[in-house]
Amino acid sequence: MIETSDLKKVYKNGTVALDGISINIPDRVTAIIGRNGAGKTTFARIVSTQLMPTSGNARVNGLDILKDTKKIRNIMVSIPQEASPIGVLTPMEQVKLFLVGRGMSVNEANTVSSATLDELGLREFKNSPSDMLSGGMKRKVFVCMALAANPDVVFLDEPTTGLDPISRFEVWSAVKQLKGDVILTTHYMEEAENLSDRVILFEKGRVLEDGTVKTLLSRFKGKVRVELHHGDNYDVKVGSMKIKYVDSRDAEDYVIEGNTVKAITLDDVFLIHGVEVES
């Protein structure tokens, strides 16, 4: 359980990254979504005790982030977006070193590392230099660290940013095997829908939406996405589920041959809020 109370972060240049976040994140998989600069990473860094808040506080399983830093780090694994394995080390060495650093004996770390890498499909590569691995495999090594350490809480910051679709699915499969509470930040709506039980939408350091995927979609029941099909195969996706206007000069050049009506998705919920915030 993560609880935050009026959490604020203002950087020295005056940028307000978090503007009074008060939320409770219960024991399950939670996705924090939002555009770049919404405050997702700042939130993750503060709650994982890597960054001090300007004001406010947070608790992780009852532990105070300002007073119980060491205890929180012992029960949490945080994987930042920029994390990358040390190229000369093998995945086996990476995971074993990580576990020993958290207090596990060398013999136990060796056994657990090998078994966990096998479990996540890295048996063939566990003794190869990490700089020979694909982007997806490198990210899986870090998920493997979290799985092997068996912490109470795992924080994943943008776990699949920059990965190709195949690598992204590989990482998703690995994440689904994590035990304990998992909190991930992402701007991929498909990722949030596939991995999380609950979604929290951040925008400009504030919480705009908070609930299960099913609950969020039900709030927009009756709204649909409409795509207009033109004669030259040019499709127009209608934002905010409605057509605001059609320029008559454009209409002269195109013939509407048909349309497709689709059910609203989490991606659409995100886009709707984006329009509302910017207007």
Predicted regions and their residues:
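Catalytic Walker B motif of ABC-type/P-loop ATPase nucleotide-binding domains
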Residues: 154-158
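Conserved ABC transporter NBD signature motif
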Residues: 56-67, 71-72
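Conserved structural motif at the start of ABC-family nucleotide-binding domains
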Residues: 2, 17-18, 73
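ABC transporter nucleotide-binding domain
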Residues: 170-247
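C-terminal coupling/interaction segments
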Residues: 240-279
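Conserved ABC ATPase signature
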Residues: 88, 129-136
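Conserved ABC ATPase "signature" region
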Residues: 96, 100, 107-125
